[in-house]
Amino acid sequence: MAARLHLRLGPRLRGFASSFAPLLAAHPRALPLSRMGSVAPLAAARARRGFGSAVATAPPAEDEDFATAADLQFEPPLKVVKYPDPILRARNKRINTFDDNLRSLTDEMFDVMYKTDGIGLSAPQVGVNVQLMVFNPAGVKGEGEEIVLVNPVVYKMSKRLLVYEEGCLSFPGIYANVVRPDNVKIDAQDVTGAKIKVKLSGLSARVFQHEFDHLQGILFFDRMSLDVLESVREGLKDLEKKYEESTGLVSPESIENYKGRKDLISFSR
């Protein structure tokens, strides 16, 4: 689905997205995810079997810093941050203030997502380094489920792995295969601060995992195999060059010097 994901998935997922959309009912974005009428039961039914052991995504430490009011400030209209801007690698703080400003931020994120033909967006992608994501697998305003997840923690992933072509609004024009688990189980909070448990599968699980990676400072090429990474090398170099030309700064990352990420949970077959 080359057109619908801040994670923009490649052409092979277009049909999957269109077939999934009718299963999603219209839903107000402030409604807690635990009460979603269609996505949660559907995902739970698909995720009943095949979960592996707990993954290394630990709860926050007691002394972990939370986002301040300044961390959550933003000026509309929001713009998508492009690779290799260091904002995409920066630490994203947890949120403990659930107010009108947070609701406004999620509203703005949805607006950007729809305007850029996305189906998911993380806060760091619009320059706000906090643990927040929004997504709607339908990809159309007024259709499907508008989902907001705050401070998400993954506690289980399925052993079943799937390969799909992904893209990302922060990497315009770049698409490549990424391996990810088909199902995930999540602890999070909704936009009101209520604690929720979520089970996701299929497209929703993939969108979530792509966005969740952003919240950890992980970019989708970090999960590509060496041969797949080689296929997008020139595209990444072009983005690095554009960054230097537009900012007058040396690119903070260089694909030519990239050694991979050793801190990732491996999804390789």
UniProtKB/Swiss-Prot annotation:
Mainly expressed in mature leaves and sheaths. The active site is at 211. It is an enzyme of class 3 (hydrolase). Keywords: Chloroplast, Hydrolase, Iron, Metal-binding, Mitochondrion, Plastid, Protein biosynthesis, Transit peptide. Residues 1-51 form a transit peptide. It catalyses: N-terminal N-formyl-L-methionyl-[peptide] + H2O = N-terminal L-methionyl-[peptide] + formate. Removes the formyl group from the N-terminal Met of newly synthesized proteins. Belongs to the polypeptide deformylase family. PANTHER family: PEPTIDE DEFORMYLASE. This is Peptide deformylase 1B, chloroplastic.
